[in-house]
Amino acid sequence: MDEKIVKFMRDNDKVAVWLNIKILEVRTGYSRISMIVREDMLNSVKICQGGAIFSFADFAFALASNSHGKIAVGISANINYLNPAFLGEELIAECFESGRSRKLGLYDVKVYKDENKKFVASFTGQVYIKEEKFEV
């Protein structure tokens, strides 16, 4: 993936900036990112808010789906949670392209805790692929 596109997406996605997401790897149809669970991400029972995990997975989805250079926008997404994440834990999200046609793409994101790869959540998403390319 063009490094200019990665930089553009990293710098201009305000939620990814707020989450302080680190981009570890991006290649065509794949991304791997990380973030540390902070206190302002916790819900009332002191576990990471599901919306923060969803947004984290969604950014991995955005990177992988836009890695071909054409603008791809999410049209459907779903997440299932298995284990909680706690304050100070590092989360890793890996996104894999499971299929892509001229206009649509399907992606799977796995979120886990880095220290032991304990599974946290599974996210699936679909994109609509526009004709427009990134101009950065």
Where are these regions (language model features)?
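Hydrophobic beta-strand-centered segment that forms part of the acyl-chain substrate-binding groove
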Residues: 62-91, 97
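A generic structural signal for short beta-strands and their flanking turns/coil linkers
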Residues: 17-19, 29-31, 71-77, 89-91, ...
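Catalytic strand-loop segment that frames the active site of acyl-thioester-processing enzymes
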Residues: 18-48
